[in-house]
Amino acid sequence: MDLNNFMFFINLFHRFYFLFFPVYNGLESGYSHFHADYYEYYEFYIYYLFFAGFTFFTFLSKGVIHMKLICSKSNLLNGVNIVSKAVPSKTTMSILECILIDATKGQITLTANDMELGIETVIEGEIIEKGIIALDAKIFQEMVRKLPDNDVTIETDASYKTIITCEKATFNIIGKSGEDFSYLPQIERSDSILISQFTLKEVIRQTIFSIADNFTNKILTGELFEINDNVLKVVSSDGLRISLRKIELKNSYSDKKVIVPGKTLNEISKILSGDADEDVNIFFTDKHILFEFDNTTVVSRLIEGEYLKIDNILSADYETKVKVNKREFLSCIDRSTLLVKEGDKKPIILDIQDDIMELKMNSIVGSLDEEIDIAKNGKDLMIGFDPKFLIDALKVIDDEEIEIKLLNPKAPCFIKDEQESYIYLILPVTFSTVA
């Protein structure tokens, strides 16, 4: 409450007192001494007092600023963009469509929560009046995005009316009570690992593409995070391919195994800075996983169940080993997809003979036949694959030269490095011989 409002209220009370004081004195002295002038206006005084009092308390409630804060547009927009990734696209609970602004604890905290994934981040700014408000995420995000690049002032009152001001632009919107918002669950910060933001971002990038994109098998919509002998193993699969990354951890950690939703990892990868000098703390419980980095906290429910047992699959024998330049191989496969119409699943055929691998594609659009040099050990082989699956794996491999291991036309191929820090398993597809 500012000084002008305070003085207005004092003056109003002052007037009420001197208006009612004569009536009160007259009543104290008994009706026999009650002055006729006072009695004539007594009923009017009572109604007036009731109306003025009601108006006063209504004004007191709605006119007082319940929250006021100032922060730069860039800080605010960055925070809103981070937490908005946890706002559900569809929900029956309107409060979950909001971003919570909490300025009650000496810092400005933004939170969004869809009950499966919750994100909280702290932004820099000045708190003039402490308070809390929930604002529609889509509207608020667009408002902030389109404001001038200057300081933004956010004010609210008891009726949740929110005024957002920046330079000469002023938005008025109605928010919701922050008391109804679902806060992030309290997670015990005891069982954890520490890795760099760069490493986590890379691990997600190199595995996320092969998770299942439907809920026929919910477990496959997530990724396995397994720690064993201080090695973090991350696995994803959609049933037709498997992606695996191994990371040696610097410190000693207890063994653990959890399934993290792909949506959670996808959103985290967009937030991480990718800085090798900045770390991420990852905390594990039976039901949740928590990622803590910079000024941001991400909490996600885990997927319950048993993940695929892949150890026996990945240790399969091979009869043909090929070493090939990754960039040349990828470019050739990419060219072949020009002949495939959307929705038409045509395989690319690898005809491996001596030191040459011939790539063939045949469709109603046309055909492709291209040779690339390889180093081969073992038998000649002809095998077909979905070109998209090969492209997805090759795009995330940073090595200049890759190694492909194959057994027969019906067995999966393995793309891996010598240390097996990454392994990509891809099932072959049937094909007819290209003329």
What are these language model-derived features?
Residues 9-12:
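Hydrophobic, low-acid, alpha-helix-prone terminal segments
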Residues 20, 24, 38-435:
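Structural preference for solvent-exposed beta-strand-turn elements
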